Design a protein with these regions (language model features):
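Conserved donor-binding/catalytic core segment of Leloir-type glycosyltransferases
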Residues: 1-12
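Cofactor-binding loop segments of dinucleotide-utilizing enzymes, especially the Rossmann-like FAD-
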Residues: 8, 36-38, 63, 105, ...
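A conserved mid-protein helix/loop that constitutes part of the nucleotide-sugar donor-binding site
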Residues: 10-23
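Nucleotide-activated donor-binding/catalytic signature segment of Leloir-type glycosyltransferases, i.e.
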Residues: 29-71
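Catalytic binding pocket for nucleotide-activated donors in carbohydrate/polymer assembly enzymes
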Residues: 66, 71-166
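C-terminal amphipathic helix plus adjacent low-complexity
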Residues: 124-234
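Low-complexity, polybasic segments enriched for Lys interleaved with small residues
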Residues: 243-246, 250-251
């Protein structure tokens, strides 16, 4: 399983938890990790070291590239985001649109947007852990790996559900309207869906008859022999020159 990390490398994003369990995760043999980002020097050096120590397990790009970030979102199977706090978070939403399942800590916007997988009902489109604890994070990663390797149909269904999740303003606006309606006690006006007006039978028959008559007329017109039109030369013909001949008088000799 390929796990992606696209983030600022800071404590707020939970990299102290990752640092604590990175050695164990690299030795687990069940995943590969790709990291993209810049931040605190200690974490930049941490990923440089592990990409040198486990070159076939971990790849670290200590930079930021929007183009590369989208390639990571698209290529990975899971996306790790163990933030200490997260007011909203966009990376988990972007990853879901690519069918990459987020592994997150239940805080702020991560808790609001990532519904954890329920093995009994099949609901959800991600994996989450509650406490800011490295062991819980690792256990959550292992749970995701178990589904990925041992229950492919469930994993594929989670991907479909993740890609179908809608966090657009259309949905948010509807929720705000419902909230204001509840607070104020003013009922929302019901949406009036107008059914398409069907033409009356008489009008429908009239249109059919007109179309039929028009097609009949076109057939008759096309069957007529073409009219031969004499085309006159618009330019006058040049006048013919007449030759004048003179008769010579001859005298007979006597």
């Amino acid at each position: 399983m390929l796990i992606g990390v696209v983030s600022r490398l800071t404590d707020q994003k939970g990299f102290d938890l990752i640092a604590y369990k990175l050695e164990e995760l690299c030795q687990s043999g069940g995943c590969q990790i790709v990291v993209l980002g810049t931040g605190e020097e200690q974490y930049e050096n941490l990923f440089r070291h592990y990409s040198w120590k486990y070159p076939e397990i971990l790849s670290a790009q200590i930079t930021y590239s929007n183009e590369m970030s989208h390639k990571i979102y698209a290529a990975c199977d899971a996306f790790l985001m163990p933030s200490a706090f997260e007011p909203c978070g966009l990376s988990q939403i972007i990853s879901m649109k690519y069918g990459t399942l987020p592994i997150v800590r239940e805080t702020g916007g991560l808790k609001d947007t990532v519904i954890p997988y329920n093995q009994y009902t099949g609901e959800g489109y991600g994996f989450s852990f509650a406490n800011y604890n490295a062991d819980e994070m690792l256990g959550c990663i292992y749970s995701a790996m178990d589904v990925y390797y041992n229950n492919k149909p469930a994993w594929l269904q989670l991907q479909k559900q993740a890609m179908a999740a809608d966090y657009s303003w259309d949905v948010s606006a509807e929720k705000y309207i419902d909230l204001y309606s509840t607070v104020t006690g003013i009922a929302r006006p019901k949406k009036v869906v107008k059914a398409p007006v069907k033409p009356k039978k008489s009008e429908f028959e009239k249109h059919i008859r007109e179309d039929f008559e028009a097609s009949e007329k076109a057939i008759v017109e096309s069957a007529k022999e073409p009219e031969i039109i004499e085309v006159k030369n618009p330019f006058p013909e040049p006048e013919k020159k007449t030759k004048t001949t003179t008769k010579k008088k001859t005298t007979k000799k006597k």
